[in-house]
Amino acid sequence: MILKQAILTLVLVNANLFAQEPPKTYSSTDKETRQGPPKPPMGKRWVLNPDFSDEFNGTELDTTKWLDHHPTWIGRAPGLFMSSQVSVGDGFLKMEGKKLEKDTIVHAYGKDITFNIAGAAVVSKKATKFGYYECRVKAAATTMSTTFWFSSSNNFKGPKDCDRYGLEWDIHESIGREGDFNGSYFASGMHSNAHFWYTDCNGKKYDHRAPQVKFEDAKLTSEDFNVYGGWWRDESTASYYYNNRPPKHQKFYDKVKKKPFDQPMYMRLVNETYPFPWIELPNAEELSDPSKNTVYYDWVRAYRLVDVNDPNSEVEKDPTLKLYHENVTFPSATIEHKRSKSLEIPLSYQANEDREIAFILFDNEGKKIKEAILTAYAGYANLEYTLQLDQKLPLGSPYKLSAHIRPLKGNKKNSLDESTVYIHLTK
């Protein structure tokens, strides 16, 4: 209660201490990069998870999804998380770092802590588990952090019952400028970590880390927007995605628990001060410069896997959100298939809303043999479609199968995309 009252008092007292100068205007389309989830496993479909997704197109934080503070952490001194430094506008979630006019002492964790810098934190109200998570963000050009991460409590029962553990999954952490300090490399590229926080039966605490994943880049994270993504695949592994780069993969630390990352975590977007002297503290000049002191989150998006044929009807979809260039594709130009009364055809599609895929099978002379319709539920799907035939087809020349993705009850005239595959029948 003392801690909550102290934070509230600080927010009220300091909310008006800072002059609000208009920052440089950024466009959410400054640079196009790869975005959206990777190809899903066979038989699965990525769908948007709205509880952890936000385009930040309003004028205030969506309090049905987010807290404007960290519920259990007030910040790493000398940086204090303050709700006054969180805002939404111009299509962005903004976090503004500032120098406090005077030192502020907060009594927390059984001691007095001195703060002189204002930072910010936005935390999801719900916890989540496996899925793909990404954000598009431009870092502040300071030594304060720009982060996209998840964590749990540290009080889950361990394998010995008397021990405890917690989880932290850092998709990305960075700063926005370089300097003469060891952590200067955090100002460029992407840096991903996974922590297994462990307390043994004697109360000794350990930070067990998986090998760090890095993507190198010549440009600073504050020069432009970047897309950072992470696929929490299962209890043991994750994959990371940086702009248009191929993914890199990580195996979680598993010497205490064979499947360590088995608990839900909360999403956290944080602008904090890092440990000094590993990273230099931000100076007053950069903290007073509106062109440098603000983090811009363009959007955060989360996806979960469902079965291909799951309508996902319990989730309300936003028809204005165009996540994909809608398409249907086959994995190759030709396939071989054993002669049968059905054809099993691998394909994938991306659809912003429920669509249908029209299949037409032709013989070598262009004669239409079979037509069929597949309902393509919204999302990114990878599947094997079974085309039922009236009879076994003769061997010989290849057959052509065309696929058109279109609106429900549509026709060829309003086709959104089409693909073709040639099928060679074998005995």
Curated annotation (Swiss-Prot):
Q: Which residues bind substrate?
A: 73, 76, 168, 173, 272
**What are the subcellular locations of this protein?**
Periplasm
- Please indicate if the UniProt record lists Cell wall biogenesis/degradation as a keyword: no
Is Disulfide bond there in the keyword field? no
GH16 domain boundaries: 32-308
* Keywords, alphabetical: Glycosidase, Hydrolase, Periplasm, Signal
Instruction: Give the gene that encodes this protein.
Output: porD
SUPFAM superfamilies, alphabetized: Concanavalin A-like lectins/glucanases
Q: Which stretch is the leader sequence?
A: 1-19
Annotated spans, Disordered: 23-45
| Role according to the record | Cleaves the sulfated polysaccharide porphyran at the (1->4) linkages between beta-D-galactopyranose and alpha-L-galactopyranose-6-sulfate, forming mostly the disaccharide alpha-L-galactopyranose-6-sulfate-(1->3)-beta-D-galactose.
Q: Which GO terms describe its molecular function?
A: hydrolase activity, hydrolyzing O-glycosyl compounds
An example of a Gene Ontology cellular component annotation for this protein is: periplasmic space
- EC number in record: 3.2.1.178
This protein's species is Zobellia galactanivorans (strain DSM 12802 / CCUG 47099 / CIP 106680 / NCIMB 13871 / Dsij)
Reaction(s) this enzyme catalyzes, per UniProt: Hydrolysis of beta-D-galactopyranose-(1->4)-alpha-L-galactopyranose-6-sulfate linkages in porphyran
The family this protein is said to belong to: Belongs to the glycosyl hydrolase 16 family.
Any one GO biological process: carbohydrate metabolic process
Q: What's the protein here called?
A: Beta-porphyranase D
Active site, per annotation: 168 (nucleophile), 173 (proton donor)
